[in-house]
Amino acid sequence: MTETERSNESLLEEIENLRVENAKLKNDLCLERSLNNASDLPMSLDEFKRYGRQMIVDETEGLMGQLKLKNASVLVIGAGGLGCPSLPYLAGAGIGKIGIVDNDTVDTSNLHRQVLHDTIKVGMLKSESAKQVLNKLNPHVSVTSYPVRLSNENAFDIFKDYDVILDCTDTPMARYLISDVAVNLGKPVVSASALRTEGQLSIFNFDNVGPCYRCFYPTPPAPTSVSSCQEGGVLGPCVGLVGVAMVVEALKLLLGVYTRENFKPFLLQYSGFPDQTLRKFKMRGRRVDCPACGTGRTVTRESIESGKINYQSFCGSRNYSVLTEDERIDVHKFERDYWNSSKTKPYVLLDVRPSLHYSISHLPNSHNITVNELRDLPADLNNLQSKIPHLSADSEVLVLCRYGNDSQLATRLLKDKFNLKDVKDVKGGFFKYIDEINPSLPKY
């Protein structure tokens, strides 16, 4: 280390010591004023008792720190897997104003991980369900729900009244929008994602000098590589841990723990299996050429609100519409045809869901082969026949998946790659069949 570097390090250490000392003096002065005039306390006696064990932690700066939280506001976008663990800890910590953006409703399939909601709230708006819980948890916190889908048209109006944004969404499209709006308004974003047994989180646009989401990810991922909890699954405690970690970072921002001198861009990664691991990676700072936060930025409020920036087009989407109407049948025709005992040559029913899905619930006499397996097989009918007994070139084949998306891709592959002539996709898939034909089958 050079003499200059040692000198700079010494100065930074001295600045940090002075900051801590200044905070302590402010805290002592605030407390002294409060005690001299008990009728003019900065918080109610209930709040002192409620937050007491938090205030005596050195890192929270005592009463001064608690007043920072009381006067702070946090917007949580998404009251799902990440939002549910985040919200009660924000309210419990005494954040003065909390906003919740979510237009989705509670579903039974959410409850294993979205533990802020419960069985009797199935069908209720998630934002309203969460608001009810927070109001009961801490009456000293003001909670506003926004039961709307966040868009380029409403994001600026919603964001403007909040100090910190928590991005608890689950799509790249939403993350780009949130980051872009936050940069334009000068708001920091705590952003996280979680899937299966893993998760990650970062802070974007710290103090208007930190990198934004576009700096980390200039190009969106291919739509085919993006998986949702609905498709890929998620373990509740794993996403819960990441959501709670988001609150820790939000508190650091609000308490002033991070400064321009000590903040370093990072990516925190959590993995729950096979061993629990938590790793922190140092990331690069702002990109000079970033269109959102760089020197010649083009992602402006006007370009966002006017729709010039098309987030859906930028991020892309999977194209499942690869069949004609003649190549598809509805579940009612499927029910009539598949179980037709008078048919001399039975249909071959292919279920192209992942094998783990298939093991949970499936129709009798079906054969399980995934879309990826079909893609990987050499283009020869003999290879396909080795996987599916009784299949021949003139077989009548019906294809089923979970929702009727992958089955369309599989039908196209069977016809184009393996030259099968009579292949039909079942619209809406296995779940549509359960909903409209046989609700006694397990729906997961």
Curated annotation (Swiss-Prot):
In the N-terminal section; belongs to the HesA/MoeB/ThiF family. UBA4 subfamily. Zn(2+) binds at residues 212, 215, 290, 293. GO terms for molecular function: adenylyltransferase activity; ATP binding; metal ion binding; thiosulfate-cyanide sulfurtransferase activity; URM1 activating enzyme activity. One of its GO terms (cellular component) is cytosol. The active site is at 229 (glycyl thioester intermediate), 401 (cysteine persulfide intermediate). This is Adenylyltransferase and sulfurtransferase UBA4. It is found in: Cytoplasm, Cytosol. Its EC number is 2.7.7.-, 2.8.1.-. Its main location: cytoplasm. Plays a central role in 2-thiolation of mcm(5)S(2)U at tRNA wobble positions of cytosolic tRNA(Lys), tRNA(Glu) and tRNA(Gln). Acts by mediating the C-terminal thiocarboxylation of sulfur carrier URM1. Its N-terminus first activates URM1 as acyl-adenylate (-COAMP), then the persulfide sulfur on the catalytic cysteine is transferred to URM1 to form thiocarboxylation (-COSH) of its C-terminus. The reaction probably involves hydrogen sulfide that is generated from the persulfide intermediate and that acts as a nucleophile towards URM1. Subsequently, a transient disulfide bond is formed. Binds 1 zinc ion per subunit. ATP binds at residues 81, 102, 109-113, 126, 170-171. Coiled coil: none annotated. Pathway: tRNA modification; 5-methoxycarbonylmethyl-2-thiouridine-tRNA biosynthesis.
